[in-house]
């Protein structure tokens, strides 16, 4: 609908092949390959948008819809003690820190009336079997609530959408 309404849409993904296929399906959308869990790649994305290196984008952004996620090893997905600390850190980098970094960088480009939409997970609500993925989505939920309060005086809305089970 955003494209149909004449908006510029930028789709960002870490898998170039999937990104290319999605770009073909959504004619008119710009695409950019980036692993949101890697700081240097998100810095490149922000630079490309701010400096007009992506057609239709420049020094203002009307909204953000952030839906980054990595999932745990299937063998330990419900555990909070079996995964290695590095696996938890990688999950936090993609599922929480990437959102934080992108919002921080794009916030100055958002005008009053803009909206930030964060895609969470029911694992951020459930108290059982969420494993380290649940830890990351609980953290994202907390961040979304705090961000909403901080952005209110700026006239920027923040929504956390918690869909049922999906694959991103």
What are these regions, as identified by a protein language model?
Residues 1-9:
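Canonical Rossmann dinucleotide-binding motif of NAD(H)/NADP(H)-dependent dehydrogenases/reductases
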Residues 26-40:
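Rossmann-fold cofactor-recognition segment
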Residues 51, 93-114, 149:
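Amphipathic alpha-helical dimer-interface segment in Rossmann-like NAD(P)H-dependent oxidoreductases
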Residues 56-60, 69-89:
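Conserved mid-core segment of classical short-chain dehydrogenase/reductases
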Residues 59-69, 95, 118, 159:
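Rossmann-fold scaffold of SDR-type NAD(P)-dependent oxidoreductases
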Residues 70, 115-139, 144-145, 149-152, ...:
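Catalytic loop of short-chain dehydrogenase/reductase
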Residues 81-100, 117, 140:
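Catalytic Tyr-X3-Lys loop
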Residues 157-167:
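Conserved SDR Rossmann-fold cofactor-binding beta-strand/turn motif
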């Amino acid at each position: 609908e955003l494209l149909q309404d004449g908006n510029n849409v930028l789709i960002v993904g870490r898998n170039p092949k999937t990104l290319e296929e999605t770009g073909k399906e959504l004619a008119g959308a710009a695409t950019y390959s980036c692993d949101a869990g890697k700081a240097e790649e998100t810095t490149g994305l922000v630079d490309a948008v701010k400096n007009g290196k992506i057609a239709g984008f420049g020094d203002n952004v009307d909204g953000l819809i952030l839906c980054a996620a990595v999932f745990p090893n299937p063998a330990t997905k419900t555990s909070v003690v079996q995964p290695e600390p590095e696996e938890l850190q990688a999950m936090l980098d993609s599922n929480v820190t990437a959102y934080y970094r992108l919002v921080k960088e794009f916030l100055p480009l958002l005008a009053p009336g803009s909206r930030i939409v964060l895609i969470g997970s029911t694992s951020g609500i459930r108290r059982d079997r969420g494993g380290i993925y649940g830890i990351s989505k609980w953290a994202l939920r907390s961040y979304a609530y705090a961000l909403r309060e901080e952005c209110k005086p700026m006239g920027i809305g923040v929504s956390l959408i918690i869909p049922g089970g999906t694959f991103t």
